[in-house]
């Protein structure tokens, strides 16, 4: 007698999860690293930023959103469009789960990066209101600074009113100059927000714009435009994954932080024998970990230094070991084709390693970061209502 009500509840839950969904298309474009490599300027980029990606790893405290590792954005390939103001002013952004602020270039910004991207013009918006609070986010080459304003923000038909956002007036370094994106929309917890700003997704929930307090990410592995890649607000789409979601509790609210049981290479445990912490991050393209562990991992997969970065012999992909992250008792296995980044340089195939050293200091770290290399293989659901992350094998 209890079977029917239970079935109805399951169907209701499934309907909510897949019913009223607001989809934001994500387009895939060549990363800044690929563009610099193709232009023969990558080594000059490392020198200009005083970074040796083989011998040095960027150190980050990550105690708040006001400190971001700049290298995270070098390999970003997935971007979406938002609009701010009325009439709308469009911007290309990274949807980033490891930060919580929204910022775009201001018309008052004189940095070279701002001149290369659309700039927000408050005088041209009928719904803009000045807040005037200064904000600052520290990056590897300096601080991005600006002021906070408020306006309506639209994301694929979802319009948040009174959203506070950063108008950058200074953007550091060359990374933002050549980037495909104009700004960043953070999807982390409110505790990460610089200036005490309420994040966009929190306002979506508060203004009843989403049917469920969750969003999900599907990143297509198709290198040509990433057709089908999308960020979904209000639930998840089961057509993008196989099997069922493995729900993993968030261990610390701020980042989307979860526990790793262990990390295996070639089927044998290699790291985190007693467990460790990781964050699922749409704003980091690679998989990062403590530099001493990553050096061991690069050696285990056969990656060697080449022009300031780690690469493998492309013809060895079929004999390279799998790398498995065991999460909540479930193995998530990446084959060599999944954790390497193919490219062509001067007509020759190049296979870069998808792993990068990044030392995150206590009390936030050490942390592993499961970026796009991981998310491409595993559909990811971020559930604020139950403070958990859902993972399942992505459908190619």
Curated annotation (Swiss-Prot):
GO CC field: endosome
Keyword set, alphabetical order: Aspartyl protease, Autocatalytic cleavage, Disulfide bond, Endosome, Glycoprotein, Hydrolase, Protease, Signal, Zymogen
Signal peptide range: 1-19
Propeptide residue intervals: 20-53
Molecular-function GO terms, alphabetical: aspartic-type endopeptidase activity
Glycan attachment sites: 90
Chemical reaction(s) catalysed: Similar to cathepsin D, but slightly broader specificity
Enzyme class: hydrolase
A single BP term in Gene Ontology: proteolysis
Location relative to the cell: Endosome
Family indicated by similarity: Belongs to the peptidase A1 family.
Known role: May have a role in immune function. Probably involved in the processing of antigenic peptides during MHC class II-mediated antigen presentation. May play a role in activation-induced lymphocyte depletion in the thymus, and in neuronal degeneration and glial cell activation in the brain.
Protein name as annotated: Cathepsin E
The species this protein was found in: Oryctolagus cuniculus
Lineage of the organism: Eukaryota, Metazoa, Chordata, Craniata, Vertebrata
Name of the gene this protein is made from: CTSE
């Amino acid at each position: 007698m209890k079977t029917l009500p239970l079935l109805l509840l399951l169907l209701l839950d499934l309907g909510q999860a897949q019913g009223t969904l607001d989809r934001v298309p994500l387009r895939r474009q060549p990363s800044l690293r690929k563009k610099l490599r193709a232009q023969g300027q990558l080594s000059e980029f490392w020198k200009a930023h005083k970074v040796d990606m083989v011998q040095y790893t960027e150190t980050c405290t990550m105690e708040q959103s006001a400190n971001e590792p700049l290298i995270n954005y070098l390999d970003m390939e997935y971007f979406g469009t938002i609009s701010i103001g009325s009439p709308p002013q469009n911007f290309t952004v990274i949807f980033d789960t490891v930060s919580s602020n929204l910022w775009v270039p201001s018309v008052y910004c004189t940095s070279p990066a701002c001149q290369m991207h659309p700039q927000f013009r408050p005088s041209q918006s009928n719904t803009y209101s000045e807040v005037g609070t200064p904000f600052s986010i520290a990056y590897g080459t300096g601080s991005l600074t600006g002021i906070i304003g408020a306006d309506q923000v639209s994301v694929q038909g979802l319009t948040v009113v009174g959203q506070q956002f950063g108008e950058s007036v200074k953007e550091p370094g060359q990374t933002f100059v050549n980037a495909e994106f104009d700004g960043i929309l953070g999807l982390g917890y409110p505790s990460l927000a610089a200036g005490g700003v309420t994040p966009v997704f929190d306002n979506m929930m508060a203004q009843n714009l989403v049917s469920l307090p969750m969003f999900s990410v599907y990143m297509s592995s198709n290198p040509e435009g990433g057709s089908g890649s999308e960020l979904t607000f209000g639930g998840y789409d089961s057509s993008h994954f196989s099997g069922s979601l493995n729900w993993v509790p968030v261990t610390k609210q701020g980042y989307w932080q979860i526990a790793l049981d262990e990390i295996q290479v070639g089927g044998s445990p290699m790291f985190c024998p007693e467990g460790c912490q990781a964050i699922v991050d749409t704003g980091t393209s690679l998989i990062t970990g403590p530099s001493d562990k990553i050096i061991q991992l690069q050696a285990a997969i056969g990656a060697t230094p080449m022009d300031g970065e780690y690469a493998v012999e492309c013809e060895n992909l079929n004999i390279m070991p799998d790398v498995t992250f065991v999460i909540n008792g479930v193995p998530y296995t990446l084959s060599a084709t999944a954790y390497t980044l193919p490219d062509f340089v001067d007509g020759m195939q190049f296979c870069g390693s998808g792993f990068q050293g990044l030392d995150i200091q206590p009390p936030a770290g050490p942390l592993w970061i499961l970026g796009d290399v991981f998310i491409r293989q595993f559909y990811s659901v971020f559930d604020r209502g139950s403070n958990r992350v859902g993972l399942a094998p992505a459908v190619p």
